[in-house]
Amino acid sequence: MAKNEIPRSFLNDLDAYIEKNLPKVLEKYTTETLGDRSKYIGASDIAGCLRKSFLSKKEKVEHSIAKHIIFQRGHLTEQIVELMITGTNYKKQVELCSKTYNGFDIKAHLDFVIENEKRAVVLEVKSTSTPVDEPYESWILQIQLQMGLLQKR
């Protein structure tokens, strides 16, 4: 083994630790910041695949480490956007709640809301692995629901 080489066994142990620990840490963080997502319908649930959303409420969804890292990249993007809007009158992670006509809880967690005396602007931050020319329909539906809930506030 070379002088500065890290032993393979250490790297294997570290990989195993990360694979076991990262999902637990992220699940705890999500519950602390968004609540138990199985107990309410979120704006992204309504805007996305309804079957996938329904099943995610009934059974715990397991994600690969690669998928967890992709999700975290989105959170890092939010931090960059927050730096970009510093100095404006913004609020971060604004939670809005309502109920459907048949009593289900709906919650939306708006990444950012910038307000002045005339208007409120919702910023929903998305990160993608490839450039996107037009927003996806699910993104548009999500932001429309968020704006509707914000208007009802």
Where does each model-flagged region fall?
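Secondary-structure boundary elements
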Residues: 115-119, 148-153
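Metal-dependent nuclease catalytic cores that hydrolyze phosphodiester bonds in DNA/RNA
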Residues: 1-122, 129-137
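Short, charged, amphipathic alpha-helix that recurs within catalytic cores of restriction-modification
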Residues: 135-150
